[in-house]
UniProtKB/Swiss-Prot annotation:
SUBUNIT field: Probable core component of the endosomal sorting required for transport complex III (ESCRT-III). ESCRT-III components are thought to multimerize to form a flat lattice on the perimeter membrane of the endosome.
Classification via InterPro entries: Snf7_fam (IPR005024)
Chain coiled-coil ranges: 21-221
Leader sequence residues: none
Lineage: Eukaryota, Metazoa, Chordata, Craniata, Vertebrata
Protein known as: Charged multivesicular body protein 4c
Amino acid sequence: MSVFGKLFGGGGKGGKGPTPQEAIQKLRETEEMLAKKQDFLEKKIDAELLIAKKNGTKNKRAALQALKRKKRYEKQLAQIDGTLSTIEFQREALENANTNTEVLKNMGFAAKAMKTAHENMDIDKVDDLMQDITEQQELAQEISDAISRPVGFGEEFDEDELMAELEELEQEELDKDLLQISGPEDVPLPNVPSNPLPKKTAVAQKKRQEEDEDDMEELKAWAM
């Protein structure tokens, strides 16, 4: 017999017992009823106390009867307080048990779903699959590296030798340029006409010669 069956007397010849939800609802209704009874008794106690005070000096017999009724009401109130504590404890225990039952039910449902999901899975197959994936990734990386690597189509050159040859060519060109602008004495000048030039022509020629010399000086300074 289940725990709930033992609690509520289910599983016997009387038939199926109440569900936890039904029992919890009944306990809450009982708590509400007892709470109303508490309010009623507290009002009765206050009323009897008022009667006892009112008749304390005038009618002692009535005052004593009121105090006796007050004591009975107080006793009933104490009993209800104890009953409420017991019912509250029982309801909380039942609610916790019901919560645990729902949690376990959902966990079992999830476990079955996980088992179903893993039915067609085998750890060895998973390991093999992961190994295949790793190998394919490595192969893809090797292919990418091979494609991106410069290809000489059978011609392989030493980069250092090529750089040295390029530097030699650059030095030769530089030396050649320096020889061409080594100085004004190496630059052939135009022939001077033997016939006297007009004054204006002589001045223009002199100015042009000075400009040429200035240009040569700038080239020489740049070369150095």
